[in-house]
């Protein structure tokens, strides 16, 4: 065993106080497993704009008591240095139902308490959106949510919200990361093992439980978005699944707030279960495989609508039984434009004072990998459309900044294709709880009129043109391979000029935007207008036929994602062109066999 590895082992054993993770490292040492020890100890888990996310096991590169302690110490010091009166403003801490989430939350709470912070620690598991909502409403300095969202059961994460209630963005991530590196040794005066004492938080020992206050205030705020008292709704059953996560009781409360008939829960998945026993991936975005029990429940209860939250309830999936008896799982773009249309129709409920402004005083946002249909809608209806980078750290901050510019504009809606939706400005992050209640009301209004969600989507396509997309991914477990694949596509700046056969002009590439290098030949100076990041891989190709294809490395999972969209007036033509485009993107750009990329198991 090398001196380097021995030094890393000794450092870990000096700092780690958890017997389970200490034994993991000791066992690896005893087995002389140098390779695994290097994987666990050589690199530190990186703190980025998404905070931390990784597998729960021993080692500096993983999620465990020690790395959460170190992250909390660094965050604490950064907040003290950056936000005035941060200790009296306090920190809000929430956690989901995963293994170790409560323990990690206690560590975070004890760390901040040791520095004299007021600590709001939820007494029960909560949806991620509750923390985003709670931070500004409690006038706190910072928020932390312990969750790995829809990741596999062995993962966990540490998500940070700024005092605005928005996810942190650059440069905060770099500042926090630097402070973590300066505070690696656990502070001696922190005790995270004692039982939590709740009180008013003023005695230097107790913590404040914000659960009842925030639950009441949150539902009071989202009630403003309900239009059920003004329109007729069908009396039809709706099936809901929490996907073994936290959403059940909170979605139930949101339905009650909207005065909707109680949903029918998927019994096997309504209670939190850290093992996620009924699904391979606890991710409703995976489609019919993840929604198998939901469909069975719906069939048994004569329901044609399924609403599904992911485990931390910040995202929403939707499925509907069609007239032919088959089930359609709507993708994120379809749900996004449907909710955008609902927000546009009911924009007075999203306007302060309940009045209606000029069309160009409203704005909506979606991400660069989401459908161009929202932009098409904006051009036809006259509202402002803004495009931003992938992730709600961009959408939330863009919405917050625009609202606080005081230029008379009103934010209506923002979404990303990965089934994340922000309806209104109750909070500035994606929220599957309020989205579920809002979508239920929308769907029931359609059913009352003899229509359906799919029928309404078709009517939107007739108005704005068919915008049909295919988004999928391959697993890419090695970061160096991800970079290599994208660099091969760049070909030292000599990008492909077309896809397909020489005599097929429709896939001639008319524009390339590379947000890793900052190149965008859609502008005279060939400089990208969206923010550029050399540490993330993302290239978009625009085709002569109006189609768009984006390739992107995920920031939170080992996935190389592709997003392809075709636009046109005739559905069958758009669908066939999309099928061909996806095939070309996979075979000519991604080259999964050559690059040894692993497809999803259900493909």
Curated annotation (Swiss-Prot):
Binding site for Mg(2+): 149, 310, 312, 314
Active site: 149 (phosphoserine intermediate)
UniProt keywords, alphabetically: Carbohydrate metabolism, Cytoplasm, Glucose metabolism, Isomerase, Magnesium, Metal-binding, Phosphoprotein
Gene Ontology terms for molecular function: magnesium ion binding; phosphoglucomutase activity; phosphopentomutase activity
CDD domains: PGM2 (cd05799)
Modified residue annotations for Phosphoserine: 149
Catalytic activity annotation: alpha-D-glucose 1-phosphate = alpha-D-glucose 6-phosphate; O-phospho-L-seryl-[protein] + alpha-D-glucose 1-phosphate = alpha-D-glucose 1,6-bisphosphate + L-seryl-[protein]; alpha-D-glucose 1,6-bisphosphate + L-seryl-[protein] = O-phospho-L-seryl-[protein] + alpha-D-glucose 6-phosphate
Primary role: Catalyzes the reversible isomerization of alpha-D-glucose 1-phosphate to alpha-D-glucose 6-phosphate. The mechanism proceeds via the intermediate compound alpha-D-glucose 1,6-bisphosphate. This enzyme participates in both the breakdown and synthesis of glucose.
Protein's name in the database: Probable phosphoglucomutase-2
Species of provenance: Dictyostelium discoideum (Social amoeba)
Gene responsible for this protein: pgmB
């Amino acid at each position: 065993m090398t001196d380097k590895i021995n030094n890393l082992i000794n450092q870990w054993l000096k700092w780690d106080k958890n017997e389970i993770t200490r034994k993991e490292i000791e066992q690896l040492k005893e087995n002389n497993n140098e390779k695994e020890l290097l994987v666990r100890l050589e690199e530190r888990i990186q703190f980025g704009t998404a905070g931390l996310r990784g597998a729960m096991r021993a080692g500096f590169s993983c999620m465990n008591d020690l790395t959460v302690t170190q992250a909390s110490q660094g965050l604490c010091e950064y907040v003290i240095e950056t936000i005035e009166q941060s200790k009296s403003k306090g920190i809000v801490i929430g956690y989901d139902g995963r293994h170790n989430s409560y323990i990690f939350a206690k560590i975070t709470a004890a760390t901040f308490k040791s520095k004299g912070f007021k600590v709001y620690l939820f007494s029960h598991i909560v949806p991620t959106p509750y923390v985003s909502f709670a931070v500004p409403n409690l006038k706190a300095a910072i928020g932390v949510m312990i969750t790995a969202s829809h990741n596999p059961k062995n993962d966990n994460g540490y998500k940070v919200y700024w005092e605005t209630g928005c996810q942190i963005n650059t440069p905060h991530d770099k500042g926090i990361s630097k402070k973590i590196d300066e505070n690696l040794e656990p502070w001696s005066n922190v005790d995270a093992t004692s039982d939590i004492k709740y009180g008013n938080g003023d005695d230097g020992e107790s913590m404040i439980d914000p659960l009842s206050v925030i639950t009441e205030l949150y539902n009071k705020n989202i009630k403003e978005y309900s239009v059920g008292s003004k329109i007729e709704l069908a009396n039809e059953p709706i099936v809901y699944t929490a996907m073994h996560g936290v959403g059940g009781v909170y979605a139930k409360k949101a339905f009650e707030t909207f005065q909707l008939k109680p949903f029918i829960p998927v019994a096997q998945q309504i209670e939190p279960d850290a093992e996620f026993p009924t699904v391979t991936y606890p991710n409703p975005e995976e489609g019919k495989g993840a929604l198998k029990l939901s469909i069975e429940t719906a069939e048994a209860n004569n329901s044609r609508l399924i609403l599904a939250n992911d485990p931390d309830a910040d995202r929403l999936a939707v499925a509907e039984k069609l007239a032919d008896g088959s089930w359609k799982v709507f993708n994120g773009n379809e749900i996004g434009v449907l909710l955008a249309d609902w927000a546009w129709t009911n924009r007075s409920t999203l306007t302060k004072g309940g009045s209606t402004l000029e069309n160009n005083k409203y704005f909506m946002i979606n991400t660069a990998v989401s459908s161009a249909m929202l932009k098409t809608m904006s051009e036809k209806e006259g509202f402002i459309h803004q495009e931003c980078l992938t992730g709600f750290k961009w959408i939330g901050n863009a919405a917050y900044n625009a609202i606080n510019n005081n230029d008379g504009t009103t934010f209506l809606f923002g979404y990303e294709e990965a089934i994340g939706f922000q309806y209104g400005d109750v909070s500035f992050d994606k929220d599957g709880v309020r989205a579920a209640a809002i979508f239920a009301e929308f769907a029931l209004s359609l059913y009352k009129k003899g229509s359906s969600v799919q029928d309404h989507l078709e009517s939107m396509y007739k108005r704005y043109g068919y915008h049909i997309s295919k988004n999928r991914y391959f697993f890419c477990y090695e970061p160096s391979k991800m970079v290599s694949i994208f660099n091969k596509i760049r070909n030292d700046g000599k990008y492909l000029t077309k896809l397909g056969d020489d005599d097929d002009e429709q896939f001639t590439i008319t524009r390339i935007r590379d947000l890793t290098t900052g190149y965008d030949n859609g502008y005279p100076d060939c400089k990208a207008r969206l923010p550029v990041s050399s540490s993330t891989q993302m290239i978009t190709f625009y085709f002569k036929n109006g189609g768009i294809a984006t390739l992107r490395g995920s920031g939170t999972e080992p996935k190389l994602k592709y997003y392809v969209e075709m636009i046109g007036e005739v559905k069958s033509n758009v669908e066939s062109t999309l099928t061909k485009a996806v095939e070309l993107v996979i075979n000519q750009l991604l080259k999964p066999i050559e690059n040894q990329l692993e497809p999803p198991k259900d493909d």
